[in-house]
Amino acid sequence: MNYDIIDAKYIEGYKLELIFKDGKKGIVDLSVYIHKGGVFSRFTDIEYFKQFYVNREIGTLCWPDGLDIAPETLYHVATGEPLPVWTKTEKAVA
């Protein structure tokens, strides 16, 4: 998929430069994930965060314990391109 990440470089703090399969690249600031809690609460430890790697099999960023972020979400944040339609949820009909 074009959303697949082929390379990632640490910049500073929670900022990474990502390069995608379609040649586009951009910078993402993943500090917003700290406030999401749950599995992302691990990001409060910057040394943990820096252990990211690109899993080429699934085309996204991963961390050693299996945590990952959807590549289409990262593509949207890095490039400003809209999220694919299939990622949007429909409102429930009452």
Report residues per predicted region.
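Motif-centric detector for short Cys/His coordination patterns
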Residues: 1-94
